[in-house]
């Protein structure tokens, strides 16, 4: 009977840990399951070894397990309540799939609903259509000899919070009367390091028409932190280091598969995610802003040398954290970019017009995308975009 109880306790703790690691929910409660499992094992041990010195050790383990089991709930109870919540089939079923080179990518051939809610109010309720190639749907030219305009970046390019017909690539294609072969390579949570690696690996090659190419990258200040793996969801991306000429060079993966598994597992605990992971992810030897500038130089280099393309960087200068540091790094490195405030002069004065739900959701609105699309369309058609 005792052996059966031991086996049951061991099975319980193994099931708990595996369940937390590999299932999407419950999140942030890893230590609860570990603590309860340890307590069950320790309780069995205390009865098994009662009257011996091992009994005291089991009692200590029991108390330790009970303490562990309350750490995550305590942290969650003291955390600020989420201002917004994501709902719909996009968040529940689709969102990302693994990618051995870039860390993660979009699923292929799916249509998902994305809802964002705050305080009982629906911020947006939209549909995302992902084509068979893993790109956000964009109506484009069917002429095999036309020029290419490739939009690359993160959620700003992808069009989070917007329907398919409101994204920047789609509005640009509409403004140019489907004159160009337009592809939306945007993936939410990407950084410039993933854009650069995709270009180096020739990811756009199968989708290029025979004409010349333009690569439009939408930049935000947070891409600097993403390039140095400052977030748990970015641990499997490509790593870069600055070369002697200030151009970023590929340096393998940000973390090994084993390290990525450990970090992903630890992130399932609210306590460990708050108090342990920041120290593990921090890389004091890397200057995120200089690296970001080096990545921008590398992106332009690959665009020009590999694709003979004009590289266009749109920089969202919307007064957020790290923006001054990124601008200073760009200026010091001689990185050319187009500030979005140049395209939209009242960007800071009219945040409600150009951001979905400021200050909690700063993604561009369709109105902002229309102005940017019109700017790009005019400059490309009159040949002044590279000037």
Model-predicted segments: where are they?
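Conserved SGNH/GDSL esterase-like catalytic core that processes O-acyl groups on lipids
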Residues: 158-243
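Internal/C-terminal transmembrane anchor helices
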Residues: 52-78
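Histidine-centered active-site loop/cap adjacent to the catalytic His
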Residues: 3-4, 358-387
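Serine-dependent acyl-ester chemistry module
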Residues: 9-20, 24-25, 220-354, 358-362
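Membrane-embedded alpha-helical segments of integral membrane proteins
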Residues: 3-46
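Short, amphipathic alpha-helical "lid/cap" segments that border enzyme active or binding sites
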Residues: 192, 196, 289, 293, ...
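Membrane/wall-proximal cationic-aromatic binding patches
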Residues: 78-175, 344-350, 355-359
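Membrane-interface junctions at the ends of membrane-embedded or membrane-associated helices
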Residues: 1-5, 42-54, 381-387
């Amino acid at each position: 009977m005792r052996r059966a109880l031991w086996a049951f306790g061991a099975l319980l703790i193994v099931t708990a840990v595996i369940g937390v690691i590999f299932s999407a929910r419950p999140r942030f409660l890893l230590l609860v399951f570990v603590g309860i499992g340890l307590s069950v094992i320790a309780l069995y041990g205390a009865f098994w070894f009662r009257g011996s010195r091992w009994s005291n050790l089991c009692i200590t383990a029991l108390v330790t397990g009970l303490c562990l089991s309350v750490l995550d709930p305590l942290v969650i109870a003291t955390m600020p309540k989420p201002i917004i919540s994501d709902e719909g089939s996009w968040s529940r079923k689709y969102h990302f799939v693994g990618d051995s080179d870039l860390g993660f990518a979009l699923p292929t051939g799916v249509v998902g609903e994305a809802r964002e809610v705050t305080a009982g109010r629906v911020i947006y309720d939209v549909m995302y259509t992902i084509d068979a190639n893993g790109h956000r749907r964009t109506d484009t030219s069917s002429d095999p000899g036309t020029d290419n305009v490739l939009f690359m970046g993160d959620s700003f390019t992808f069009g989070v919070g917007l329907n398919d017909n409101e994204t920047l690539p789609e509005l640009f294609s509409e403004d140019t009367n489907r004159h160009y072969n337009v592809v939306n390579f945007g993936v939410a949570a990407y950084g410039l390091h993933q854009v650069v690696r995709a270009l180096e690996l020739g990811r756009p090659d199968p989708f290029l028409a025979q004409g010349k190419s333009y690569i439009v990258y939408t930049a935000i200040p947070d891409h600097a932190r993403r390039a140095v793996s400052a977030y748990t969801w970015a641990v499997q991306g490509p790593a870069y280091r600055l070369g002697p000429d200030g151009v970023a060079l590929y340096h393998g993966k940000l973390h090994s598969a084993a390290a990525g598994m450990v970090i992903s597992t630890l992130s399932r605990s609210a306590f460990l995610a708050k108090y342990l992971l920041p120290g593990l992810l921090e890389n004091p030897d890397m200057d995120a802003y200089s690296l970001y500038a080096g990545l921008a130089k590398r992106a332009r280099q690959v665009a020009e040398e590999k694709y003979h393309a004009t590289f266009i960087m749109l920089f969202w200068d919307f007064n957020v954290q790290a923006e001054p540091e990124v601008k200073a790094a760009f200026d010091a490195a001689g990185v050319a970019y187009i500030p979005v405030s140049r395209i939209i002069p009242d960007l800071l004065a009219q945040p409600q017009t150009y951001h979905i739900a400021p200050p909690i959701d700063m993604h561009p609105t369709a109105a902002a995308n229309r102005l940017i699309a019109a700017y790009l369309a005019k400059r490309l058609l009159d040949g002044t975009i590279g000037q």
